[in-house]
């Protein structure tokens, strides 16, 4: 069913959930895995960059480290992942990379936001559901590493 799964990852708890659920789905379907980390270029980051030269470069360096850890974890699970770290607006970058790699499933984490925060920052999920040309899984099932590896073991991994 799914042959090319894109995992959106930012190192957060929600990103970890997306990584776990996406890896389980990819394993179940025998899919190729793609990983994307987006350094969000938000107004806050631009303000930080204006007052602290190098703030964006530091944020990118942090994300590169998170990306490498996630890639290593996926390799340990038997995947041969491909991916990259980009800077920009997460929803736009995820949709663009999904088209680029011809993904048939995109997995993102769910981060709860208040009404004001949703209005101010926009809706990544809504943008993706409108702009993706493939299925979208919004990972919400927070499982521990033990449960995750147990599910992989019972799946024949």
List each language-model region with its residue ranges:
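A short acidic, glycine-rich active-site loop
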Residues: 52-65
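Structural beta-alpha unit
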Residues: 72-106, 143-157
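Conserved beta-strand positions in the Rossmann-like core of class I SAM-dependent methyltransferases
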Residues: 34, 82, 137
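Short secondary-structure boundary segments
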Residues: 37-38, 109-111, 140-141
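Small/aliphatic-rich secondary-structure junction motif
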Residues: 1-53, 131, 156-157
